[in-house]
From Swiss-Prot:
PROSITE patterns: TOPO_IB_1, TOPO_IB_2. It catalyses: ATP-independent breakage of single-stranded DNA, followed by passage and rejoining. This is DNA topoisomerase 1. The active site is at residue 773. The gene is top1. The modification Phosphoserine is found at residues 52, 54, 136. Eukaryotic topoisomerase I and II can relax both negative and positive supercoils, whereas prokaryotic enzymes relax only negative supercoils. It comes from Schizosaccharomyces pombe (strain 972 / ATCC 24843).
Length: 814
């Protein structure tokens, strides 16, 4: 129950007239999703029933003939013309975003380890099936047609007719260039040179290690151990995580202990630490817990001062000067050392992430400008002046030897250009998609196994938005995509049902039971034939690289990821077209989230149910009850004012579900406590201000006791209401009460909609598809077209990232 509810009750009892305009209903911004049926954009068009096929369809592909191979090779090697989609931004009048007053703040198996294949284009045992030609089931598929070529600068074509460019700015405009630089209105978006001049201040390194107090030690076999600082730091990483699930994972423990001993040896530390089970990290753990509690209980002023000092130290690293403009830098902090967690069942979880030094880092900066200073006594690995890349610094991390970069922030011009090009590329696919689908459907019946596998993989990537997948090493997480599907990941159920069950990206389980095209089902059955067994690749003639190389021959820049972006944006566009008319704001947001959730399901963007989800649902239910209680009181006020309404409006006598006398007693106690809390907080705020001006003017405690009597009066009045079953309307007129009742009905509907949205979204994550796959112009145009504040659909982070899409007009078409 919020304090606003307490206000509502106390004001009516004290007979204070409610005045002013009605508050607008507010929905809490949510990046969560809601329920929707599965809707793959192609499932209807591609999974049509075909003619029944005889048993001879299961005959293996016969040995290919030379002439057939030649003909098909010629057909598949035809060049496709390049085209750029009619992208860009159209001008449209900006619709004002009405800020709304908050009426109510929202309370807010893995599959078993599989055998791996050492090579992507061969089965585990090395056996290769002969390439065979299948019985004739030809299809008059038309080869991919060439599409006319247009200019490579699509953004200019959709510029507003009166849009200004950097060439015709006034002096006043130039003063605001850093803040309002709209790169998307520029005529020149160069794919090669990314910048002309670049200045920055480098990166921030992790602070040096501070040794533990002398009385805090690692205990080994009952005895304290005096570790050298380097080893003590690593032991502390584990001790700080002692009560987490990670620290209880045997793989995590083994990897940590191995690297801990390695650091001990590197320090030439003479020790007898041999067994992890004899290590006791309790002292260290309690020390870190104490430090956490001290930080939590730190006075607000002290926290503010520490934050201010940190911000001042970091300020110069947050910005760079790009082509004379001040632009924000993204991840300018070098990740501190620690223990690698990894996602899912990662085999390297618990391994030591070592401290990064300047000698590992390459700096990229403009020529003729000061090079950032490294740490004292150190030097950069290399200083480059490469204006064809967008990173400011790079290095290799030690866990997986991955390359790490420092880029500009998500809302920067370079990042924005990259995003716009990505979404334009997916729009461009619209001009090719029909021919590409005809092509891969023809390949589904190809005489060549490699083409048949490629066509089947393209079908799965297109229809079910599967990732392409890459071959994994033994020391990498066992995650799978389309090209790396293994025998055990695909189960076939005649006549044409396929069950996919594997760990996808980030070790998130992908489970989907779907009906597929009969030819696809038949192909998968062929690809699983003996001698293939568990651990063997389904697509043993196909790799991600070869697939993407082939896709590039169909359309410049086309890859499996472009298909995901295309299908995500296409699905969202189609779902938004189903928008019913005359919806409330809350229902519009729910509709949008359900459309978004359809995309998230398509892309397998899942999440686990939060631990406090049930608690949140209970809070929602209680808040709805509190609003129903207010509605019941308003109805009683109306009946008290005009008793005859009991006959003409019998709905005023209707009981509110769940509002019993026992619940009301408990609720009255809650209102009483909230009123006291509100009075105390107001008293404390006043005293803080008075103390700052003149310590002698601070209000005495006796004043607080006087003020708290108002809460006691409220309690007495509420108890009297409960006994009499009547509520005094005070000075309120019938018209005012009716307005308040209508407002309250709307608030209850909003709260119920929020509750539905929250519950439907508990296992699906909206954020990933919003940030990476759905064209943001779809959301901006929807926002303007349906008068939904963009703040209800996009968080500030996403709005900053896609600032280039903010001018999208309401009639923009994907």
């Amino acid at each position: 129950m919020s304090s606003s509810d307490s206000d509502s009750v106390s004001l009516s009892i004290r007979r204070r007239q409610r005045r002013g305009s009605s508050k607008r209903i507010s929905m809490k911004e949510s990046d969560e999703e809601s329920d929707s049926s599965e809707n793959h954009p192609l499932s209807e068009s591609l999974n049509k029933k075909s003619k029944s096929e005889s048993d001879e369809d299961d005959i293996p592909i016969r040995k290919r003939r030379a002439s057939s191979k030649k003909n098909m090779s010629n057909s598949s090697s035809k060049k496709r013309a390049k085209v750029m989609g009619n992208g860009g931004l159209k001008n449209g009048k900006k619709t004002a975003v009405v800020k709304e007053e908050e009426d109510f703040n929202e309370i807010a198996k893995p599959s078993p380890k599989h055998k791996r294949v050492s090579k992507a284009n061969g089965s585990k045992n090395g056996a290769k099936s002969a390439v065979k030609k299948e019985e004739s089931d030809t299809d008059d598929s038309v080869p991919l047609r060439a599409v006319s070529t247009v200019s490579l600068t699509p953004y200019k074509s959709e510029l507003p007719s009166g849009a200004s460019t950097t060439q015709n700015r006034s002096p006043n405009d130039e003063e605001d260039e850093d803040e309002d630089y709209k790169w998307w209105t520029s005529e020149n978006i160069d794919d090669t040179q990314k910048w002309t001049t670049l200045e920055h201040n480098g990166v921030i390194f992790a602070p040096p290690y501070e040794p533990l107090p002398k009385n805090v030690k690692l205990i080994y076999d009952g005895n304290p151990v005096n570790l050298p600082p380097e080893a003590e730091e690593v032991a502390g990483f584990y001790a700080a995580m002692l009560e987490t699930d990670h620290a209880k994972n045997p793989v995590f423990q083994d990897n940590f202990f191995r690297d801990f001993l390695k650091v001990c040896d590197e320090c030439n530390f003479n020790h007898n630490i041999k067994e992890f089970s004899k290590c006791d990290f309790t002292q260290m753990f309690h020390h870190f817990e104490q430090k956490r509690e001290e930080k939590k209980s730190m006075p607000k002023e002290q926290k503010k001062a520490i934050k201010q000092k940190k911000d001042e130290e970091e300020e110069k690293y947050k910005w760079c000067i790009l082509d004379g403009r001040k632009e924000k830098v993204g991840n300018f902090r070098i990740e501190p050392p620690g223990l690698f967690r990894g996602r899912g069942s990662h085999p390297k979880t618990g391994s030591l992430k070592r401290r990064v030094y300047p000698e590992q880092i390459t700096i990229n900066i403009g020529e003729g400008v000061p090079v950032p200073e490294p740490l004292p006594g150190h030097q950069w690995a290399e200083v480059k002046h490469d204006n064809t890349v967008t990173w400011l610094a790079t290095w290799h991390e030690n866990i997986n030897n991955n390359v790490k970069y420092v880029f500009l922030a998500a809302g920067s011009s370079l990042k924005g250009q990259s995003d716009l090009k990505k979404y334009e590329k997916s729009r461009k696919l619209k001009d090719y998609i029909d021919d590409i689908r005809k092509g891969y459907r023809k390949d589904l019946k190809s005489e060549l196994t490699v083409e048949r596998q490629r066509g089947t993989a393209m079908y799965l990537i297109d229809v079910f938005a599967l990732r392409a997948g890459n071959e994994k090493g033994e020391d990498e997480a066992d995650t799978v995509g389309c090209c790396s599907l293994r025998y055990e990941h695909v189960t076939l159920k005649p006549p044409r049902t396929v069950v996919f069950d594997f760990l996808g990206k980030d070790s998130i389980r992908y489970y989907n039971e779907v009906e597929v095209d009969p030819q696809v089902f038949k192909n998968l059955k062929i690809f699983k034939r003996p001698p293939k067994k568990e651990g063997d690749l389904i697509f043993d003639r196909l790799s991600t690289n070869s697939l993407n190389k082939y896709l590039t021959s169909l359309m410049d820049g086309l890859s499996a990821k472009v298909f995901r972006t295309y299908n995500a944006s296409y699905t969202m566009a189609e779902e938004l077209k189903k928008m019913p008319k005359n919806l409330t704001l809350a229902d519009k947001i729910l509709f949008y989230n359900r459309a978004n959730r359809t995309v998230a399901i398509l892309c397998n963007h899942q999440r686990s149910v939060t631990k406090n989800h049930d608690v949140q649902m209970e809070r929602f239910a209680e808040r709805i009850k509190a609003l129903q209680y207010q509605r019941m009181r308003l109805r009683k006020m109306m009946l008290n004012l005009e008793p005859k309404l009991a006959k003409s409006k019998p709905e005023l006598l209707a009981k509110e579900e769940g509002i019993t006398d026992s619940w009301i007693v408990k609720h009255h106690e809650t209102l009483y406590e909230l009123e006291k809390e509100k009075i105390k907080k107001k008293f404390d705020r006043e005293n803080e201000k008075l103390a700052a001006e003149d310590p002698k003017s601070v209000l005495p405690e006796s004043e607080l006791e006087v003020r708290l009597k108002a809460a006691d009066e409220l309690k007495k009045a509420l108890d009297a209401e409960l006994k009499s079953k009547k509520v005094d309307p005070g000075r309120s007129s019938m018209e005012q009460l009716e307005k308040r009742l209508n407002k309250l009905n709307e608030r209850i509907n909003v709260m119920r909609t929020q509750m539905i949205d929250k519950d439907e979204n508990k296992t699906t994550a909206l954020g990933t598809s919003k940030i990476n796959y759905i064209d943001p112009r779809l959301t901006y145009s929807f926002s303007k077209r349906e008068d939904v504040p963009i703040e209800k659909l996009f968080s500030k982070t996403i709005r900053d990232k896609f600032n280039w899409a903010a001018d999208t007009p309401p009639d923009w078409k994907w």
